[in-house]
A protein has these predicted regions:
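Sec-dependent signal peptide cleavage junction
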Residues: 23-41
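Acidic/aromatic-lined carbohydrate-recognition and catalytic surfaces
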Residues: 119-128, 147-154, 188, 195
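Well-ordered alpha-helical scaffold segments within catalytic/enzyme domains
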Residues: 42, 55-58, 63, 105-122, ...
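Conserved, well-structured interaction surfaces
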Residues: 92-99, 110-125, 185
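Bacterial Sec-dependent N-terminal signal peptides
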Residues: 1-14
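Hydrophobic core
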Residues: 15-25
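A conserved hydrophobic secondary-structure block that centers on an alpha-helix together
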Residues: 177-178, 182-224
Length: 224
């Protein structure tokens, strides 16, 4: 798939802003809705909105393969020395937080499960799978197993407040003191459950047996 430059980045933001404008206008009353009727069609291109909204994740990819994996040509490899490579930055910083990542991945996967035909018809399935597979690859790399039992898992990579104090591109953030990996063997059951949910729905959607194996192990960890 062709990489996208700054122009597409601007268009993605514009599409999101247009949709926000449409939603906000709808709340302001029937009179305003009537005045918008003539131009509403120009905003309600939900096929394009779906496509552009997924570019958000290309912009937030982390790892030693970002240069080839991201759809944006202005993104490149970063944080290649992380103890757990890959995944996605949290929005607005360079930390990889487990809870929002797990929730996001499971929500993306469930959206595809519910509306598979729409993704297929719009040609967006391959992009969606690339994103959910990347999330799930990170969750599996973050999980240490003994047989089918989780012995420990990583629930965060990066130091929250210290990272928030640094303003730079991820490609130029080379201070390894900011890239601590946090592991646990008997805590963070909520995060383990989110990982499990994301892996389970990705297995349902795309059939990777390893996703199911890790989903079961993390689920069992989360309820023990």
């Amino acid at each position: 798939m062709k990489k996208l430059g700054l122009g597409k980045r601007v268009l993605a933001c514009a599409a999101s802003a247009a949709t926000l404008l449409t939603g906000t206008t709808a709340l302001s009353g029937l009179t305003t809705l009537g005045s918008m009727a003539a131009s509403a069609a120009s905003y309600d291109n939900y096929a394009k909105l779906l496509q552009y909204s997924m570019y958000f994740y290309d912009g937030n990819m982390c790892g030693s393969d970002v240069g080839s994996a991201s759809q944006f040509d202005w993104r490149d490899n970063c944080h290649g020395s992380d103890e757990v490579d890959g995944g996605f930055h949290d929005a607005g910083d360079h930390v990889k937080f487990g809870l929002p990542a797990g929730y996001t991945a499971s929500t993306l996967g469930w959206g595809y499960y519910e509306f598979k035909d729409s993704y297929d018809a719009l040609g967006q399935t391959a992009h969606l799978q690339a994103l959910t597979d990347r999330f799930c690859d990170f969750f599996k790399a973050s999980t240490k197993l003994s047989g089918d039992t989780v012995t420990s898992f990583c629930y965060q990579v990066g130091v929250g407040q210290a990272d928030h104090d640094v303003w730079c591109s991820p490609e130029s953030q080379n201070d390894q003191s900011l890239r601590t990996a946090y592991w646990t063997s008997d805590d963070a059951s909520d995060i383990a459950a989110e990982y499990a949910a994301a892996l389970a729905v990705n297995y349902i959607n795309f059939g990777n047996a390893e996703d199911l194996k890790y989903a079961k192990a993390l689920y069992n960890y989360s309820i023990k």
